[in-house]
Amino acid sequence: MRFSNFLTVSALLTGALGAPAVRHKHEKRDVVTATVHAQVTVVVSGNSGETIVPVNENAVVATTSSTAVASQATTSTLEPTTSANVVTSQQQTSTLQSSEAASTVGSSTSSSPSSSSSTSSSASSSASSSISASGAKGITYSPYNDDGSCKSTAQVASDLEQLTGFDNIRLYGVDCSQVENVLQAKTSSQKLFLGIYYVDKIQDAVDTIKSAVESYGSWDDITTVSVGNELVNGGSATTTQVGEYVSTAKSALTSAGYTGSVVSVDTFIAVINNPDLCNYSDYMAVNAHAYFDENTAAQDAGPWVLEQIERVYTACGGKKDVVITETGWPSKGDTYGEAVPSKANQEAAISSIKSSCGSSAYLFTAFNDLWKDDGQYGVEKYWGILSSD
């Protein structure tokens, strides 16, 4: 599908992240935007018929920051080639930091199954969800019970039975024996997007992945391996460090026998503000959640996500494909401007995303993550598209 879009320039205001006490948390940052337009064209895969339409595009310029990493954006901004129509309206958005969580901090290879009495985050299943798997590139999945403990092999298998319609499944780490459990439970045609979450344990993670692949599948089952999640957006790494992490992982993965794509995952804003990130990944893998733009209603989530794809594509000079590695809508939580959490709105948002750019997007997430804190706006637990509430 071919689209025309407008490049916009805006301002980023980041807030400090609280240090996690036991496990990694999902945190948000506020983003204030002011828009300037410039015409560009980009090709994006969607599920509607081929159409040429104008859409708005935001390129973000960081002006203040609570971290040294984020402040780098002031020297790596995206300049439009043409300026026109200055838009004076502002919008508040924030980004969702999604991460690996386990019952033991720092363990990238935990394999302890949870007890049968542990409550599973998939307890509320797809029975009452009308969202289908068709139309999306894939879905994200985390193997944790409501108390944060690891799901058993049997629990993971039960979860995966509900995900058979998705072509690709994204995992965030290697803890809880998740790679081997998902490899055993997935269908023969499904592919995995794996994650190396702990960048100080890259070789350990690669060893775990290699062992699982050799025991329960082949490297053909793996479509992508990511290194870290939102490191620049979270202020925990510079762009140069991200490049080093990706290089280290590529070398280790190549030695292990893997020849597929290796990427770093960050927010769309982090990439726009730090286009050096475009140099390291085999394609651009970014997270984008329309709920955190207070001016975007659920039914408009798809065009909003498409704009973020085009923004990143432009920031990278049109040289890298863009895949949305997280996008969705919460079913519970606080109303944030036009963004209203509810199951009906979640279904409307997912439908809109699929229609606009579904073949370029991983839906977030399979089941509610009740092991998380409520977080800002009280939405952190309730993104499960196959959960009943």
From Swiss-Prot:
EC number: 3.2.1.-
Keyword Lipoprotein in record: no
One GO cellular component term noted in the UniProt record for this chain: endoplasmic reticulum
PROSITE patterns, per database record: GLYCOSYL_HYDROL_F17 (PS00587)
Compartments, record wording: Secreted, Cell wall
Active site: E326 (nucleophile)
Residues annotated as signal peptide: 1-18
Record organism: Saccharomyces cerevisiae (strain ATCC 204508 / S288c) (Baker's yeast)
Leftover remarks: Present with 10500 molecules/cell in log phase SD medium.
Gene3D superfamilies: Glycosidases
Propeptide: 19-29
Transmembrane regions listed in the UniProt entry: none
One GO biological process term: carbohydrate metabolic process
Top class in the EC scheme: hydrolase
Post-translational modification: Glycosylated.
Positions annotated as glycosylated: N279
Name of the protein: Probable family 17 glucosidase SCW10
Keywords from the UniProt entry: Cell wall, Cell wall biogenesis/degradation, Cleavage on pair of basic residues, Glycoprotein, Glycosidase, Hydrolase, Secreted, Signal
SUPFAM superfamilies according to UniProt: (Trans)glycosidases (SSF51445)
Main function: Glucanases possibly play a role in cell expansion during growth, in cell-cell fusion during mating, and in spore release during sporulation.
Superkingdom per UniProt: Eukaryota
Keyword RNA-binding: no
GO MF term set: glucan endo-1,3-beta-D-glucosidase activity; glucosidase activity
